[in-house]
Amino acid sequence: LVLTFDNAARLAARIGETTITTEPLTIRQWVDVALTFDQATGRLRLAWRPVTAAADWRSTEATGLEAPAARTPSVLTIAAAGPASPLATFDGRIENLQFYPRALSADEISRSRAAQAPLADPLFAFDFARETTTSTLVDTGPNGLTGRLVNHPARGMRSSRWSGHEMCWRHAPGEYAAIHFHSDDMTDCGWPTALDWQVPADLKSGCYALRIEAGGETDNIPFFVPPPKGRPTAKIAVLVSTFTYTVYANHSRPEFRLSQRWRKGWLGQAAEWNAYPHNPGDHPEYALSTYNDHVDGAGISISSWHRPMLNVRIGYITYPFPDIRASGLRHYPADTHLHTWLEDQGYDFNIITDFELHHEGLDLLKDYTVVMTGSHPEYHTREMLDALEAYRDAGGRLMYLGGNGFYWKIALDPERDGIVEIRRGEGGIRAWAAEPGEYYNQFDGEYGGLWRRNGRPPQNLVGVG
């Protein structure tokens, strides 16, 4: 039994070879949907109504059908056709998902919707307003059939009962009981492990890259080695902006997609300079950055380093000639110039990253004489700013060597490292704007957006901004 959308924006219910459909639905409008199948009569019924006070239920049905053969074990998937691969994926919001071991009557369906609660005997009833910071779906029914989200769809989203009275999902969870699924959500490719390498205990702190070759092609995968925890090996620390790299990961610039001149210039310059040849604009299968949109037009709010990040590569250029008469480098490729200069000048330094700064705080910094940023330290958690301010106020020397720094507030997935969230709300230079009422992070429930709007402008930390 499958419920999906067709290309005409109609809901389609299918059992065996029989399909019934609704009328075309209005985009960005909440709709109540009830799908029932009565095994005794072979009746398949699909009912729907817009979620407005005056709307009536409409329905379509087919009769005389045979029940599908049971499959054991069975897996229910939401917003996709199957668990093994992302087939027939869904773009849109879902809330208040209930399943029953029998076909409900029209009256029971109406009563359940009016009460905003399941009836007494659900097989399971998911309340998406619970455990919002996690990937867990809570079943409020008697069977406790917990669900699991894959690839981090957006939570803490406005649902059908949103009134606008509360802007924070923690204060009115029933008004933020929706999950926004996107067909291009991806925080992990899910590839099997091809290589396992243990970093030697005596490897010098620094920036490294794994060079791989296959089928006549080569690639490089950068990684960073900090000193042993609690044992700095130099007086200089270079803070690598790994969270900023992740937020920008696979940024598909509009110029590359929309301008043939710009695209030709980028490809030509990459070839002429022997630069990294792959542009994220040609590879949306690896998921784009939080500076891009999902395929349904919603801004991408979650990014991950558990996937290829094509612009976090040695030799990747962002801007080609003649648009910019310079190196064309940003972020990681630009920051490597600082690392190389320090090495050439004979300075001993340690590499530390945003990850260690967030988790270790001031303890990470306190033994360094100076901490240097890279060229573009833009995205930070509260814990990171707290640590940098404490280091500075204790007499530490913080060298801000970049621009556009300490600008956006981010949240980290509490369940898994390497997954970052940004809500672009209420001000700032934004690639997209969060919807009203959706300015609070799903990962920690805090108000997101600019650090300036959280009372901590960059000028407070480094004097400029």
Regions found by a protein language model. Give the residues of each.
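Short strand-edge motifs at loop-to-beta-strand transitions and within beta-strands
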Residues: 31-33, 193-197
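Extracellular glycan-associated modules
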Residues: 1-159
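Aromatic-Pro/Gly-enriched surface loop or interdomain linker
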Residues: 152-187, 214-364
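Short, aromatic- and glycine-rich surface loops/edge beta-strands on solvent-exposed regions
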Residues: 206-212
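A glycine-rich, often tryptophan-bearing local segment used as a flexible ligand/cofactor-contacting loop or short
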Residues: 378, 382-465
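Extracellular beta-rich ligand/substrate-recognition surface
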Residues: 12-18, 183-191
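Helical hinge/lid and interdomain linker segments adjacent to catalytic or ligand-binding clefts
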Residues: 181-187, 196-198, 202-204, 324-414
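A glycine-anchored, Pro-Gly-centered beta-turn/N-cap motif
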Residues: 28-29, 204-206
